[in-house]
């Protein structure tokens, strides 16, 4: 298993990546549903049975007396409605038709009431269009966040896979180094045994070599155990069987990272900027909504249609009566001891505080990116130094082993 396979294939096929893909698809579907909510919606209503048999208390219109009347009837209703949201004004337009059939069993009489055509429109007098535009901006920003968040989550999964892979690589290098040292020490122990027989070293020196050999054996066993555990963690995360080996890649790392270029791409691809934009838009929407509630406003509703009543279905659609209605409702705050003004000031303060928090968070985020860049540059320098020191230590150990075998140590 190579590093390229782990990052570009196996990590993307893991269960964690599949879960993120499903969540991302849900976010896309939610945004698609929001856009489709502005398309015409066709609704069919059908109520075949509404049966009632009971005694009802009614008041006579002539003398005002009360009497109980038996109600034994079934009411059937059928209707269609087409609804359309108007994004420019924030209102809603409805067009439809209804028919109602009443069967009175006690009187053995049937009747039809129809509404062949009706159209209605309702909206706020002021502010509905702006609220809808703010809502559109918020939903578009949420969709952009969903795309960038998915890419960010996948990158985090790849980062986790990379961390586990490098941990396994480090354990493998430790185990290989432990094997080399153990083999070299076994050779030294054999040479020390020969020198002990020849009287070149004391038994104390030989025991020291034997103790060192046991310590190296202990280190070797731990290194093998850690390597097996790290491999198991890596393969478990990737969701593959533990029957493969990993290869040590050739590290070709850039010595430094351009901070300005990195910050540019982070702002472009990281979802944090869009998340702050959403928060700002929501605070702006909340401020505007509170202003609407605490100032002069109202609602308007316009209705026009045709209705008729008859004992036969054909007559119920003849000579329809025109039905019109206009409803205008005003909300006029007169005097509330300054409560409305204070509510607006509270919302304005929350809006300003949100803007300051966003600026502070973006500044801290840029500093965090710069710190990571500095950490990377410093780590690369340490890695180059450690690589050279490791190569020199191996050469020194080989030279020391050779000197010991020649009796110069």
What is the predicted function of each stretch?
Residues 1-75, 126, 131-134, 140, ...:
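Bacterial Sec-pathway N-terminal export signals of envelope proteins
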Residues 8-18, 25-42, 79-109, 119-137, ...:
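A glycine-/polar-enriched beta->alpha junction
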Residues 15, 200-201, 271, 408-409:
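Residue-level recognition of short, well-ordered coil/turn positions
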Residues 19-34, 153, 157-178, 189, ...:
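Amphipathic alpha-helical coiled-coil segments
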Residues 39-40, 44, 48, 293-307, ...:
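Exposed, low-structure sequence patches enriched in small/polar residues
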Residues 46-121, 248-256, 301-332:
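Small/polar, glycine/serine/threonine/aspartate-rich low-complexity segments that form flexible
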Residues 137-265, 375, 379:
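Periplasmic alpha-helical coiled-coil/stalk elements that build and connect Gram-negative outer-membrane
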């Amino acid at each position: 298993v190579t590093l390229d396979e782990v990052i570009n294939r196996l990590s993307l096929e893991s269960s964690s990546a599949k879960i993120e893909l499903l969540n991302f698809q849900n976010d896309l579907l939610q945004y698609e549903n929001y856009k489709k909510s502005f398309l015409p919606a066709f609704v069919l209503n059908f109520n075949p049975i509404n049966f009632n048999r009971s005694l009802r208390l009614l008041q006579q219109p002539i003398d005002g007396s009360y009497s109980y009347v038996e109600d034994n009837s079934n009411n059937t209703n059928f209707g269609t409605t087409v609804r359309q949201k108007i994004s420019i004004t924030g209102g809603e337009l409805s067009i439809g038709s209804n028919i109602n059939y009443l069967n009175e069993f006690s009187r053995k009489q049937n009747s039809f009431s129809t509404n062949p055509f009706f159209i209605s429109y309702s909206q706020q007098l002021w502010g509905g269009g702006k609220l809808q535009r703010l809502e559109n901006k918020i939903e578009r920003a949420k969709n952009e966040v969903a795309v960038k968040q998915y890419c960010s989550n996948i990158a985090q999964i790849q980062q986790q896979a990379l961390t586990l892979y490098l941990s396994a690589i480090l354990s493998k290098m430790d185990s290989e180094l432990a094997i080399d040292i153990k083999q070299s020490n076994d050779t030294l122990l054999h040479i020390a045994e020969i020198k002990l027989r020849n009287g070149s070293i004391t038994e104390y020196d030989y025991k020291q070599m034997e103790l060192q050999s046991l310590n190296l054996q202990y280190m070797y066993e731990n290194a093998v155990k850690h390597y097996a555990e790290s491999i198991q963690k890596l393969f478990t995360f990737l969701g593959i069987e533990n029957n493969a080996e990993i290869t040590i890649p050739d590290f070709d790392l850039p010595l430094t990272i351009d901070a300005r270029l990195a910050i540019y791409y982070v702002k472009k691809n990281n979802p944090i900027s869009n998340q702050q934009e959403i928060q700002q838009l929501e605070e702006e929407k909340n401020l505007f909504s509170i202003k609407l509630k605490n100032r002069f406003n109202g609602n308007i509703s316009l209705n026009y249609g045709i209705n008729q009543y008859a004992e036969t279905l054909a007559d119920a659609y003849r000579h329809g009566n025109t039905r019109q209605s206009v409803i205008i409702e005003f909300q006029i705050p007169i005097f509330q001891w300054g409560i409305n003004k204070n509510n607006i000031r509270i919302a304005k303060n929350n809006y300003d505080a949100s803007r300051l928090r966003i600026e502070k968070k973006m500044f801290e985020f840029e500093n965090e990116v710069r710190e990571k860049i500095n950490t990377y540059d410093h780590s690369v320098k340490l890695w180059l130094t450690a690589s050279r020191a490791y190569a020199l230590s191996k050469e020194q150990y080989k030279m020391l082993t050779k000197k010991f075998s020649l009796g110069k140590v």
